[in-house]
Amino acid sequence: TNVGNALGTALFLFFLLHGLGQPSAVAQDNLLLLIVVYTVFVVIASVVTGIVSDRTGNRRTLTVAATVVQAASGVAIALVPTFEMTMVAAALMGLGYGAFSTVGLAFAADLLPDEQDHARDLGIVNVTAALGQLIGPVLGAGLVALVGGFWLVFVAAAVLSLVGGLLTAFARHPVRTS
């Protein structure tokens, strides 16, 4: 899911410049708007879904739903590649990623097998998240080069987000050793 998020966010400026043909100054201003919209929705989703998750305990469902919302952002922009839809996609991506990053981490913590290794295990979770942010832009650049446009980047972002949801849906609680 982090790769899907990185595919969408890391290439926004290039999409505005080369996908939508915006002049450099306009694209830079619009990138700022996209970042603000994305960030506002990340914060809102993080807080709200964190509270809902704590109250209901239904972390798996919320985490999977977050991946579907994030995937919807990729589908939306692939189908309607306009700046207006890019704003909608940024909001959806922010909602999905904010919810996923908060509730997904809580869900991952619930799945940790041994209390004495929680810090190590959460370190591994953090490394995988960081790798997703590293891999996304490189993969995205390759996909743009492959098809000469951005549609495949957004489709891949949607697919990878859904794969993250499927993996979450089938994650199993381990047998605790302590």
Name what the model sees in each region.
Residues 140-161:
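A membrane-interface helix-boundary motif in multi-pass transporters
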Residues 116-146:
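A late C-terminal transmembrane helix in Major Facilitator Superfamily
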Residues 78-89:
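Helix-loop junctions at membrane interfaces in 12-TM secondary transporters
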Residues 155-178:
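Multi-pass alpha-helical transporter architecture, strongest
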Residues 44-58:
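Helix-to-loop junctions at the C-terminal end of transmembrane segments
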